[in-house]
Structures are given as C-alpha cells and as structure tokens.
Regions:
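An alpha-helical, amphipathic repeat domain used for nucleic-acid recognition
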Residues: 1-156
Length: 156
C-alpha cells in the first residue's frame, strides 16, 4: 500500500521556486497564494527565506535588470518593469546603478543589428528606427542620436 505523500510546506514550495530562478517577494507570495497557502504561512516562510538570504529583492532587481539589458531594453522600460514587482525604490536605484551600461552604445548596436545596411537618411526608415528604440525603453535624446549616428555612418 502506498503512503500518502505529505503536502510540501510553504517554505518548501517557495524554496523550490527559488531554485529555478530569482523571484521577488511579491511574486513568491502570489504563487504561494495560488497554491492555496494561507497568507500568514506564506509571510512566515518568506521572512525565513529572506533571513537566510535565499530570497533577496535587491538581488532579484539586479538580475532582472541585467537580463533586460542583455535582451536590448532601455532604462525607462527596465525601471518600469522593476516597478511592477513592488520593489523598494532603493533596490531599483541600486540595480540600475549596478548595470553600468552605455545606453547610447546599446541603442546604436540595436539599430545596427535591426536595420543593418538600410539607409537611415530616409526619413520613414529613421522614424521607424527611432520608434523602435522608444518602444524598447530608450529616451528621445538617445533614440534620435542613435538613428542620426547610424545615418551618418552609412553616408560616409
């Protein structure tokens, strides 16, 4: 006869999630709630994980920010996404400071990759390239500079 398997505790469930990837406290709480775990039990488990440094919102913020930079997103979009995780402002600021990226260079590389040898002196293509960077989370100044820089490179 098979023994009935004991349900994992809130702590065990949260730890199992953290083994796969970093999670914010809010995210873990939401996932535990979805599994039917009481809020009190979830908070106790999350406090314990935080004390043991298995769950750390500052580390989560930095990992997420680095991931988004490598995916080609700009600072506005990254900061907005970090904001959706209910992270402390200090954690978001520290994560943005830690990535130390030259945003103008990143935007320039994205345009070079996406538009290759297309003529960016054509106003319609330049507008599309600028809009692409704006949607990716770069500010207007950087987007305009990157498309202007690329159009000058092609004309030389």
């Amino acid at each position: 006869m098979k023994k009935k398997r004991e349900e994992p505790s809130a702590y065990q469930r949260a730890l199992a999630l953290l083994v796969r990837r970093e999670h914010s406290r809010k995210e873990l709480g939401r996932k535990l709630k979805a599994k039917g775990i009481e809020r009190e039990d979830a908070d106790t488990a999350l406090d314990k994980l935080n004390k043991q440094d298995f769950q750390n919102d500052a580390r989560f913020a930095e990992v997420l920010a680095r991931s988004r930079v490598s995916a080609g997103y700009g600072p506005i979009r990254i900061r907005a996404e970090l904001g959706t995780h209910c992270l402390a402002r200090e954690d978001v600021d520290a994560a943005m400071e830690a990535i130390k990226t030259d945003w103008a260079e990143t935007a320039h590389e994205l345009i070079s990759r996406k538009y290759g040898n297309k003529d960016l002196s054509d106003q319609a293509i330049r507008r599309k390239a600028t809009d692409f960077l704006l949607r990716r989370g770069f500010d207007h100044r950087i987007a305009f500079a990157a498309t202007k820089l690329n159009s000058h490179e092609l004309s030389e």
